[in-house]
């Protein structure tokens, strides 16, 4: 589907409504700086608070702006298999290139339940499906063995966004899934684990940081893929303060504050999320200046 950097793009709001004008500027910023994919309406896109009509407007506008230049992947996960399928079919109808399907949260399915969830959806769509494993938010962890079973059996499940920060799991996730199917892709779901996942044989990152620093995140991956390990490590180390600052409060609170400081969007979120504290805004201002982004 893509190799490198997929930006998990924010959803801008203004006076409580979608701000498509600011959104277009942000999408073009991503395209101009060489990102390899856009992930719309994921965690960073505040998908739980975007209604069905807004989803359609946002996905349609994204596809218009991108115009086939890079893949557009739409977040479509819920904790109901049938509701998830409905969102998948909406994305399919609109012309998305793929869907990001988070593991069902709160109801805590077993590993067999996880497998059956993805099997059910994969049998009912032709879209490429990306499994999203983020145990810190969902309360359930996709084991590497389960992911390998999915990779072996479900051919339109194209890869996994691995947001378990455990280095051992990352290594086993890449190893076992690629043994099961050589073209199965593994992307980091944590910006600060991107370099380590690449070293383990992974394929890139679905990134929050690239909202504000797309050029630098693209460089981190591109240098690694070109065999320039030291340069990739250097970029990773330079980005560490920004990676840390963008997660001092719950994502996407800090990244929206950062994009506001950069002049891209209003610093507006939907409840239950609230804007960043003054302390966080000041931290972000300093880190952005030190990173040459302000």
UniProtKB/Swiss-Prot annotation:
GO terms for cellular component: cytosol. It comes from the Bacteria. Its EC number is 4.3.3.7. Keywords: Amino-acid biosynthesis, Cytoplasm, Diaminopimelate biosynthesis, Lyase, Lysine biosynthesis, Schiff base. Its main location: cytoplasm. GO terms for molecular function: 4-hydroxy-tetrahydrodipicolinate synthase activity. It is found in: Cytoplasm. The active site is at residues 132, 161. One of its GO terms (biological process) is lysine biosynthetic process via diaminopimelate. The keyword Cytoplasm applies. Pathway: Amino-acid biosynthesis; L-lysine biosynthesis via DAP pathway; (S)-tetrahydrodipicolinate from L-aspartate: step 3/4. The record marks 43, 106 as: Part of a proton relay during catalysis. It catalyses: L-aspartate 4-semialdehyde + pyruvate = (2S,4S)-4-hydroxy-2,3,4,5-tetrahydrodipicolinate + H2O + H(+). It holds the Pfam family DHDPS. It is an enzyme of class 4 (lyase). Homotetramer; dimer of dimers. Belongs to the DapA family. Catalyzes the condensation of (S)-aspartate-beta-semialdehyde [(S)-ASA] and pyruvate to 4-hydroxy-tetrahydrodipicolinate (HTPA). This is 4-hydroxy-tetrahydrodipicolinate synthase. It comes from Thermotoga sp. (strain RQ2).
